[in-house]
Amino acid sequence: MLTEQFDPSTFYSPKTVAIAGLILGCVLIYVYNDYPTNVNVPVIGVGVRYTKWLAAVRNVFYARDSVAEGYKKANFAFQIPTLNRMEIFICDRKMTREYQNLDSDRMSLDAVVVEEFEFDLLSPGHGHGHRRGPDSVPIPVVAKALAWQRRRTANTNDPFFQEFMAEVSYGFQQEVQRLSQDPRSSTTTPVFTVPCFSFALQVVGRITTFALFGRPMCRDRAFLDLCGKYSDGLPRGAMLLRPWPKWMRPFIAKHMEAPQVLAKLKEIIGAEIERRKASDGESPMENIMDYFVDWAYKGRDTVPADADDTVAHVLANLIFASFHTTSQLLTDCLFEIAMRPEYVEPLREEIKDCFEKHGRETRAVLDSLFKMDSFIKETHRWNPLDASALARIAMQDFTFSNGLHIPKGSFIFTPNAPIFQDERHYSNPKIFDGFRFAKMRDDPKLKLTCDLATVGEYSLNFGLGRHACPGRYLASDEVKLSLIHLLQNFDITVDPSELPLKRVRYGKFSLADMSAKVSLRRLRSEVKG
């Protein structure tokens, strides 16, 4: 089931620790004693003067600390050891600009994604970065599809945005009814507790699949469960595969969940593609799947034989890319609201004022919620998912203008989380200020940098430049609409026993505790829509 999500805390069970120890032993034997340092920048970590393995093992769970240490100590760059490789971090902004927008045949983001998530083994098929086939859906087409859908939300003559809002309301009503049902009767309880992450994942899953596929697929419980299993199984499988030698990974991957779930997903999506092709353009484009089908088949003299499989695979990868990242952001927002009740009334007042000014079902409402947008962006600053950003693999040797040489195959990043705690870029960075970015809008020099979806050199959660996340606007809309519904209909609290809230670390990542819960108390009358 979708709610049966992977809990990283299972890594700490005795059985798992023993297995991890065995894996680590195999890795150490496999690589013998050490691996070389090929880039002339400082190495950060415990005992790195003598061996990199102590620091590499520590970085399995504390890589974020190493990145923060390197950011403080390094002049322009540093590197940290991991179990698989050295990772190079570029701190100098001039150097960052030199590599961030290079073509993929020189510095590839796609290659990093393929490597990090073991796509060749766990998601075999089309559209994988530097291995992208000639008939795959290009990334610019994906970006254009998402931009097309965003333009529809601003068109007052297009019903899409109203339907989008209605689906948010419907999704919440379904999940709340399920979670608040009294098992001893058919009634619902006014106060109920929910596992925050799984609740957020359910709602985000419904909204995202509406944007990608439309109805009725976004309301099909079996399909939603498959989407959840795939988005969960892919990163989990990659974490379990990564410590093993590469020659062993194909044998292990055969027994993992992600490839099997992907096959089922593609079968369902493929059948829907065939149904839509059969309409022969009689129905207008309504969602991202329609856009891709139109792109793949309309106006072409020759259609590739595997076009259906290509479109299905790209849609499956969009499910993976959107489900967990947006769910994590919504989860963090719910926890911050629950722990900081002083923000609730100002946010509710802003929602009320914007509804009165712009109407209930207009794009202008979302674009005018400056305090809410600020609260979400501050939550993102306070709880960055990844300590790094701008990840690339050098596809060929590269030399920066200052003479630093990067050999082919090197992994390059820039620090992300430490920037948000840097007083040079954020005033009072150790203090959570939910309306920080709303107040910045009064400054003509800063107001264009304040939106949640705006990227910049000191706001890298969504990337930067030509490779910035094209789905960030959809994620922003989904989180805002979710918070509007929750704030209008519920008081959100957290039990003191849950505090302080734990975060689960793995490598450079920090995630909300997936087992932590919040309590929802219904307000007097639930607002529909």
From Swiss-Prot:
<keyword id="KW-0472">Membrane</keyword>
<dbReference type="Pfam" id="PF00067">
    <property type="entry name" value="p450"/>
</dbReference>
<comment type="function">
    <text>Cytochrome P450 monooxygenase; part of the gene cluster that mediates the biosynthesis of paspalitrems, indole-diterpene (IDT) mycotoxins that are potent tremorgens in mammals. The geranylgeranyl diphosphate (GGPP) synthase idtG is proposed to catalyze the first step in IDT biosynthesis via catalysis of a series of iterative condensations of isopentenyl diphosphate (IPP) with dimethylallyl diphosphate (DMAPP), geranyl diphosphate (GPP), and farnesyl diphosphate (FPP), to form GGPP.</text>
</comment>
<keyword id="KW-0560">Oxidoreductase</keyword>
<dbReference type="GO" id="GO:0019748">
    <property type="term" value="P:secondary metabolic process"/>
</dbReference>
<dbReference type="InterPro" id="IPR002401">
    <property type="entry name" value="Cyt_P450_E_grp-I"/>
</dbReference>
<keyword id="KW-1133">Transmembrane helix</keyword>
<dbReference type="InterPro" id="IPR017972">
    <property type="entry name" value="Cyt_P450_CS"/>
</dbReference>
<keyword id="KW-0812">Transmembrane</keyword>
<keyword id="KW-0408">Iron</keyword>
<dbReference type="InterPro" id="IPR036396">
    <property type="entry name" value="Cyt_P450_sf"/>
</dbReference>
<protein>
    <recommendedName>
        <fullName>Cytochrome P450 monooxygenase idtQ</fullName>
        <ecNumber>1.-.-.-</ecNumber>
    </recommendedName>
</protein>
<feature type="transmembrane region" description="Helical">
    <location>
        <begin position="11"/>
        <end position="31"/>
    </location>
</feature>
<dbReference type="InterPro" id="IPR001128">
    <property type="entry name" value="Cyt_P450"/>
</dbReference>
<dbReference type="GO" id="GO:0016020">
    <property type="term" value="C:membrane"/>
</dbReference>
<dbReference type="GO" id="GO:0020037">
    <property type="term" value="F:heme binding"/>
</dbReference>
<feature type="binding site" description="axial binding residue">
    <location>
        <position position="469"/>
    </location>
    <ligand>
        <name>heme</name>
    </ligand>
</feature>
<dbReference type="GO" id="GO:0004497">
    <property type="term" value="F:monooxygenase activity"/>
</dbReference>
<keyword id="KW-0349">Heme</keyword>
<keyword id="KW-0503">Monooxygenase</keyword>
<dbReference type="GO" id="GO:0016705">
    <property type="term" value="F:oxidoreductase activity, acting on paired donors, with incorporation or reduction of molecular oxygen"/>
</dbReference>
<keyword id="KW-0479">Metal-binding</keyword>
<comment type="pathway">
    <text>Secondary metabolite biosynthesis.</text>
</comment>
<comment type="similarity">
    <text>Belongs to the cytochrome P450 family.</text>
</comment>
<dbReference type="GO" id="GO:0005506">
    <property type="term" value="F:iron ion binding"/>
</dbReference>
